[in-house]
Amino acid sequence: MRRTAFLLLTLALLTVPVCAVQIPGELLDALPEEAAALAESEGITEGGVQLLVQSFFDALRSSLDRSLRGAVLLALTVLLTGAADGFASSLGENASRFVPLVGVLCVTTLSAGDLSSLIGLGTATMQDLADLTKLLLPTMAAALAGCGGVFTASAWQVGTLFAADALTTLIHELLLPLVYCHIALASAGAALPESGLDKLADGLKKLISWLLCGAVTAFTLYLSVSGVLTGSADRAAVKAAQTAVSGAVPVVGSILAESAEMVLSAAHSLRAAIGAAGVLGVLLACLAPLVRLGVQFLLYRAAAFVSAVSGVKPLERLLEQLGDAFALVLGMTAACAVLLLAALLVSISMVVM
């Protein structure tokens, strides 16, 4: 009788309110409004897909409305420069020498606004992703620790935050200034075709690409290795703890071990909910800037094709290299988004056996 009463009393003490699937308010405040609303509902997957598709088409429509006017002006400038170059050729070599220079100055002037606004947009998006990383990763680490992944939570959070901050610093302090240097060299090389500055701009573009690819590869390898090593340590620690509790605590040891399994299951649900909300928030935060940068890159490629048809080689090279600048910023923004998504997916996949 005493054992039964003791068992019932112990079970009553273990009956406590559990809110393991409630997403922290700080994370909801950091997410876009649409993602925060979906995060509190049950159909986050279906609603998230619909929201992403709708946001994509809205961003595409808005980007075309903003960029088509500038692309048409660039195409008209290129065609007028080609016509003026053909007319100046009949007047002599001295007259035809300055026509491409005027065209380069016009294209550079027309592109200055796009370059400033879109590179600024990419920079702001990367900063928003960095801020979201500083809030989202500690939240995921706390949920991961609740799953029993104490070693994983500490190592993963500190290491991933450090790696993400290093990548953001590399982009802001080194790669973006190099992109501006690439643009300046491309413009100077188009104005002075025989100087070889355009080749230097191409070399600088390759250097930026190599640095970005190297940083992304290092971050990806870190996520892979840290997930494997720390996850193995956590699984061994949790199994040892369950065995110790089951054998050391009299009467209710096995019950406590089973309740630990239930707590871990609830923590897994929390981590999955936070991960889904975080993935949706990251995608919504970077979708519109990526679409706009991609549209701008394609329009500059189209303008370069028009320039090739018109026969003005310096303008063709300049427009191609300006398109490359948009592609570089697009790659940097996409790298930040993809690596944050990879960190979230690695965390979600760290299941304690």
Predicted regions and their residues:
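Extended, low-complexity, charged alpha-helical tracts
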Residues: 132-136, 143, 305-309, 313
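Interfacial loop-to-transmembrane junctions
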Residues: 204, 310-331
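Helical hairpin unit composed of two closely spaced alpha helices linked by a short loop
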Residues: 272-313
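Alpha-helical transmembrane segments of polytopic integral membrane proteins
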Residues: 77-81, 112-119, 139, 143, ...
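Gly/Ser-rich, low-complexity
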Residues: 1-100, 113-133, 148-161, 165, ...
